[in-house]
Design a protein with these regions (language model features):
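Short, electropositive alpha-helical surface patch
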Residues: 200-213
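N-terminal accessory segments that position/regulate proteins before the catalytic core
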Residues: 5-57, 61-71, 117
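Glycine-rich, charged/polar anion/phosphate-binding loops
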Residues: 76-78, 129-134, 200-202, 225
């Protein structure tokens, strides 16, 4: 039986109309696939093996990547679930040398401020094993920068604003899928979050209704790329199972 929903303000109904799922357009769940248990395990094993190879890279090759690869990865990101299906994200793909240079210059201003004044000693100590500093040459070396924006609200054709629900969570989900898709294609990424990032709105011409979420650096790793010798937590350290 399909549950009904009565719209109320406090204890008083706004309307007598009761809404059910059948009141809205629906379509059959055509593309769902169920796999036999052994195949399910095998598929997950291969997926885990592949995704566990993903590493954050800070040394990129300037080798070009065909744009259609980036477009397909972005299409995958666009399938992410979102609050009320409002899809509150916008991706700006930057490949032009002039714009990448502007972004690097603005980002390094904020990064120098961070490392010299804003960051606490504890924060700097946490970053030390990663070997990061205020110099960000990868912002110009990598073939693509993808600036991810979250939209706090949308606009109807008549100019009215539409509130977006859970834009941070929704954009985070879409970005996670994007990173995974790019890794699956054989590309490396770096999530870069200089703070504040308002300069991205100015350089990329995005409206105030959009907030920079992060800057994704995308490309092939340099031939001699090195990454920090760090490890990931085992399952038992970040998971709890409750079966009663």
């Amino acid at each position: 039986m399909i549950p009904t929903i009565t719209l109320c303000y406090g204890n008083s109904p706004i309307t007598q109309q009761e809404l059910t799922l059948s009141d809205y357009p629906t379509t059959a769940l055509k593309d769902y696939r169920e796999y036999p248990l052994e195949e399910m395990r095998e598929r997950l094993k291969h997926f885990y093996t592949d995704v566990s190879r993903r590493r954050t890279v800070r040394e990129f090759s300037s080798r070009k990547v065909p744009q259609d690869i980036i477009e397909t990865a972005l299409k995958a990101a666009g399938t992410a679930p979102s609050g009320a299906n409002l899809q509150p994200w916008h991706f700006v793909v930057v490949s032009g040398a002039e714009t990448k240079k502007k972004i690097r210059e603005a980002a390094e201003v904020e990064e120098r401020e961070f490392y010299e004044r804003r960051a606490s000693p504890e924060w700097l100590a946490a970053l030390e094993p990663l070997g990061t500093d205020s110099s960000k040459p990868f912002l110009e070396t990598a073939p693509y920068l993808i600036a991810v924006f979250l939209q706090k609200f949308g606009e109807l054709p008549d100019g009215r604003k539409v509130k977006h629900y859970y834009p941070v969570e929704s954009t985070g989900l879409a970005t996670g899928i994007l990173i995974t898709a790019l890794h699956h294609a054989g590309l490396a990424t770096l999530t870069h979050t200089p703070s504040p990032m308002k300069f991205l709105n100015e350089i990329l011409g995005r409206p105030k209704s959009e907030r920079p979420f992060l800057l994704l650096v995308v490309g092939y790793p340099a031939d001699d790329a090195k990454v920090p010798d760090i490890s990931r937590k085992p399952l038992e350290d970040f998971t709890s199972f409750i079966d009663s």
